[in-house]
Amino acid sequence: MKERDFQAEFGKRNLITGVFELKFCKKTSIRFDSVAKHQEAALLAVEGDGLYHKITDQPFLKDMNFQRKKPFDCFNLAGIPAYIVIMFWKARKQKNVYYIPIKRWCFCRDAVGRKSITEDMAEGEAMFTEDYTAKGNK
């Protein structure tokens, strides 16, 4: 499994409303700096006063002049829950997904005195947890 597989699975299974930064971890921990500063700032803005973003017009394939249909031109979101969503993956074992609110993520990053978050720590910080081991859809 790769991060793109997690992205596809998340799209099928997620029932929670909000904005999400997805992270995929095959190790015992994931670095806090895997969430870039601009991503963190955007997630905090969405939970707060708002974030405006224009969706770019991009070709579906390189060197092609036609474009993928986009749902709309832009959005302005405010007061929306924002999460870092981490899947801790181990081959042929349970695949746990943790929804950590962005403010909890920032607090944990600043308070724990280490550079990464373990699965046990993520479980303690998560607002929601899901098991993606079994195949399933919405």
Feature locations, PLM:
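Conserved catalytic cores of phosphodiester-cleaving nucleases, focusing on short active-site segments
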Residues: 12, 17-27
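Mg2+/Mn2+-dependent nuclease catalytic core
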Residues: 24-52
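Charged phosphate-binding loop/patch that engages nucleotide di/tri-phosphates or the phosphate backbone
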Residues: 110-138
